[in-house]
Amino acid sequence: MTDQTATPRSFSASVPLKGRIAIPGDKSISHRSLMLSALAVGESRVAGLLEGHDVLATAAAMRAMGADIARRDDGEWRIHGVGVGGLLQPRGALDMGNSGTSTRLLMGLVASHPITATFVGDASLSGRPMGRVIDPLTQMGADISASPGARGAKTLPLMVRGLAPAIPLSYRLPMASAQVKSAILLAGLNTPGVTEVIEPVPTRDHSERMLGAFGADLTVDIDAGGTRHIRIRGEADLKPQAIIVPGDPSSAAFFIVAALIVPGSDVTIANVGLNPTRAGLVEVLKAMGGDIELLDRREIGGEPVADLRVRHSVLKGIEVDPAVAPSMIDEFPVLFVAATLAEGRTVTTGLDELRVKESDRLAVMATGLKAIGARVEESQDGLVIDGTGGDPLAGGATIAGHLDHRICMSFAIAGLVSKAPVTVDDIAPVATSFPNFEALLAGLQQ
């Protein structure tokens, strides 16, 4: 999809990548730090916040509902919260831009407050399904009117009329979704009694960690079958916090793969969050033979962090265990790029969720990789990729990024190992999650 404001960009065969970089703050943690700070009583401070379009949409929405949020000249953010139950009626629609995380989590917050909010977004976000969040929030008493989308999906624009007091519930997640889980837990903050989420497959647990750090009455139990039971007792005050946001592993993924596949590369990526529910890509790439060293392991704000040293490696194709998918769901597009240069066949399954991301990431990656000379077969729930054994790809194509930041960056990395340049039709969407992506890449090529 292109328009008058599209910014095409070509990426060519690269010199070895060398150096040390710090990537932007984790997107998931940045969203949640703003939301919970805005519900605390008092002033919270956040350092290292990701200042991409998605997180700024969350900041604007929390301001619109009464929180005092300001960025200082030194980059630290100060948030004066309104307290749980204190959200105010926004005057206008809340513009979510391209951010599915902002939309789904804020729907949860609004659902248990006595306010009404209209959510709007860009063309990409307005095609994404919201029914998975609407169902549990409706059971808690919220009245939600959504727009009809393709194949019966409930989409933006939508209106949430919150109910206070909301109705606590016990909800078993029908699919692995950290966003649905988080929406219910955030709704539970202002709901009397205990709200429970039953999670058969673990997903990223930033919400649970951060809710605990802010003083929410939250417990996590794992039953004999490995199912997680997350319970939150509502109407407890949240205490303001000082938060340091670690580097985003989903952003680090692009430079991890680039360093592995560009011959002669040796890159250190500082301060990467390695939450076990997010670290699947590192484990999969190591299993493929990737030389990834974890240095100076430490913990910051309840989150495990390390510096990653990554060196060019000969990768081997593997069959990726579908159980690992939730811990790297956003990293599969760039893993597919790595697989195109591996020796042998890489098989991925269980990735239905990729079809309802910012784009249908399975179809878009399969089409684009074929266009630049990769051998790819698309199945209903994954891709099968036969790698080149390290030989460069043909390249020489223009790729439709479909306004999807991770697609755009994945093909940028593919261009670094292609004989002819790979052109991304519009690089602008990268700003949603990684505003300085191109600058960091250029720095490693010096």
From Swiss-Prot:
Keywords: Amino-acid biosynthesis, Aromatic amino acid biosynthesis, Cytoplasm, Transferase. The active site is at D330. Pathway: Metabolic intermediate biosynthesis; chorismate biosynthesis; chorismate from D-erythrose 4-phosphate and phosphoenolpyruvate: step 6/7. It catalyses: 3-phosphoshikimate + phosphoenolpyruvate = 5-O-(1-carboxyvinyl)-3-phosphoshikimate + phosphate. 3-phosphoshikimate binds at K27, S28, R32, S177, Q179, D330, K357. Catalyzes the transfer of the enolpyruvyl moiety of phosphoenolpyruvate (PEP) to the 5-hydroxyl of shikimate-3-phosphate (S3P) to produce enolpyruvyl shikimate-3-phosphate and inorganic phosphate. Monomer. This is 3-phosphoshikimate 1-carboxyvinyltransferase.
